[in-house]
Amino acid sequence: MSNKVHLGHTARKRFGQNFLTDGNIINRIVGAISPDDDHVMVEIGPGLAALTEPVAMGIKNLTVIELDRDLAERLKVHPTLKDKLTIHQGDAMKFDFSQLVEPERKLKVFGNLPYNISTPLMFHLFEFAEHIENMHFMLQKEVVLRLSASPGTKAYGKLTVMAQYYCQVVPVLEVPPGCFTPPPKVDSAVVRLVPYAEKPWPCHDVEMLRKVCNTAFNMRRKTLRNNLKPLLQDADFDVLGIDAGLRPEDISVAQYVAMANYLCEKR
């Protein structure tokens, strides 16, 4: 039997499907998620229910969002899960997560995300950060390193800045390829993202912050002076107290927010 087949389902490359099969890793992830009925529990991409079953066992209801129509149909007739699941068959990238919020109950979101859409999907979820208590995601290890990076390191980039603007980022555990069917070609890791109730560095306009990050990191080896020339001059850097001779990876999240706010005030 092909190593792409698990529980009678063939993994689909176009959906980026790799099914988690290691029981010890599954238990550790469920422990980190800490399912409860005080929050609306939401799983993105339940697949063949490796996380769905143990999470649903201890709670009254679990909402799942599954793009693959065949897998959504399997869940609808699952002998132990069908009465516990609220199933949305569709694209999580287009899903309005605010519709799931209930009075006094924020969302806890988790999933083994398809690696080919993990970054844009996280950016989509950041738009609903005020409604989310925390998120636990299986991602490429490289992406988790970028999310949790510190200034001055090679992994630090625009994804780091935007993620850490919205959330506390905590790596949870590493997961080798052999824990999946089929095994991915890269190492994986689980990360916890906890949206700030009050952002430590409030930004006037998140789109401006995104623009500053995109422009600054466009050419990593060049200085801020070169990369941000369309937006900021030396006199502006002097006002901000930022050394224009530094490279983009040397600048903190707070400093990126300060640049974005300064540009908003200059408009």
Swiss-Prot record:
Subcellular localization(s) per the UniProt record: Cytoplasm
Record field: catalytic activity: adenosine(1518)/adenosine(1519) in 16S rRNA + 4 S-adenosyl-L-methionine = N(6)-dimethyladenosine(1518)/N(6)-dimethyladenosine(1519) in 16S rRNA + 4 S-adenosyl-L-homocysteine + 4 H(+)
Binding positions for S-adenosyl-L-methionine per the UniProt entry: 18, 20, 45, 66, 91, 112
Primary localization class, coarse: cytoplasm
UniProt-listed SUPFAM superfamilies: S-adenosyl-L-methionine-dependent methyltransferases
Top-level EC class as recorded in UniProt: transferase
An example molecular function term from Gene Ontology annotations: 16S rRNA (adenine(1518)-N(6)/adenine(1519)-N(6))-dimethyltransferase activity
Entry GO CC: cytosol
Enzyme Commission number, as recorded: 2.1.1.182
InterPro entries given in the database record: KsgA/Erm, rRNA_Ade_diMease-like_C, rRNA_Ade_Mease_Trfase_CS, rRNA_Ade_methylase_Trfase_N, rRNA_adenine_dimethylase, SAM-dependent_MTases_sf
Keywords: Cytoplasm, Methyltransferase, RNA-binding, rRNA processing, S-adenosyl-L-methionine, Transferase
Functional note: Specifically dimethylates two adjacent adenosines (A1518 and A1519) in the loop of a conserved hairpin near the 3'-end of 16S rRNA in the 30S particle. May play a critical role in biogenesis of 30S subunits.
NCBIfam families cross-referenced by the UniProt entry: ksgA
Family affiliation: Belongs to the class I-like SAM-binding methyltransferase superfamily. rRNA adenine N(6)-methyltransferase family. RsmA subfamily.
Protein name: Ribosomal RNA small subunit methyltransferase A
Source organism of this protein record: Shewanella amazonensis (strain ATCC BAA-1098 / SB2B)
